[in-house]
């Protein structure tokens, strides 16, 4: 991974926008354009959600398919243990934004952060209370779906200690906000800072699109805002 112009970032920069020119990543099968991230003429622009439109109250989640509320083999949002843990974290009648913030904070504070050599599994992560970014993401997705919040996993790169690394985080659909909001339980962020570059969104099968890509791209930072 080669970087240039990266001195414009401070550690875990949380500015409103930055642009990265993508010299190596092919557009095929990647989700580079959508939500807070745009892709035009080889340039990715990412804007923090607070820099976009103001929250819209009462807007229906037309962009949040019903499937993002349902359990999967690895995001077991209907399991009794997941639902019991949810009840211990936040009240069922709490505002949606408050639910999301509490869930992000709980996963951030209660999971030991270390690599796990297995397919990320929300239930197993809840039981073992340990994992890397993938485990944080699937557990947050399961808790959010159990709370009635459409949730998915995003995968790409994140900037840390002067370099970009593979990373996974979440996107939550909040009706009170009026759209998708990123969340990173590893760093306890909602929204996630703008150094998160999304390549794909979805379950483990979508992440297979990244094989051969991570570690073989060059990113040139064109602009960083604060």
Give a label for each model feature.
Residues 60-62, 146-149, 164-226:
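Active-site rim recognition segments
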Residues 103, 119, 155-156, 166-168, ...:
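Composition- and surface-driven signal marking solvent-exposed, interaction-prone regions
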Residues 1-56:
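Intrinsically disordered, low-complexity N-terminal segments that are enriched in acidic
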Residues 103, 129-155, 170-173:
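Cysteine-centered nucleophilic/redox motifs
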Residues 58-131, 139, 201-208, 212-226:
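Secondary-structure boundary elements
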Residues 47-51, 152-156, 173, 183-186:
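Generic beta-strand/beta-sheet core signal
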Residues 24-25, 50-53, 158, 177, ...:
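Short, glycine-/Ser/Thr-/acidic-enriched flexible segments
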Residues 110-113, 133, 158-161, 189-190:
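Solvent-exposed loop/turn segments at secondary-structure junctions
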């Amino acid at each position: 991974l080669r970087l240039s112009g990266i001195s414009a970032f401070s550690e875990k920069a949380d500015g409103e926008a930055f642009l990265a020119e993508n010299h190596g990543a092919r557009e095929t099968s990647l989700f580079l354009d959508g939500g807070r991230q745009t892709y035009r003429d080889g340039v990715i622009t990412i804007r923090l959600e607070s820099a976009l439109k103001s929250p819209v109250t009462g807007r229906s989640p037309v962009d949040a398919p019903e499937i993002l509320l349902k359990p999967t083999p690895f995001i077991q949002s209907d399991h009794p243990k997941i639902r019991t843990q949810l009840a211990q974290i936040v009240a069922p009648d709490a505002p949606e934004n408050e639910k999301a913030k509490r869930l992000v904070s709980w996963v951030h504070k209660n999971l030991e952060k270390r690599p796990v050599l297995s397919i990320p599994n929300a239930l197993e992560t809840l039981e073992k209370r340990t994992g890397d970014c993938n485990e944080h993401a699937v557990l947050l997705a399961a808790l959010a779906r159990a709370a009635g919040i459409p949730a998915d996993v995003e995968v790409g790169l994140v900037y840390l200690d002067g370099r970009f690394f593979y990373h996974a985080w979440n996107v939550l659909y909040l009706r009170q906000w009026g759209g998708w909001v990123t969340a990173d339980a590893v760093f306890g962020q909602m929204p996630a800072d703008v150094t998160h570059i999304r390549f794909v969104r979805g379950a483990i099968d979508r992440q297979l699109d990244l094989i051969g890509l991570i570690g073989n791209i060059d990113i040139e930072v064109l602009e960083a805002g604060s």
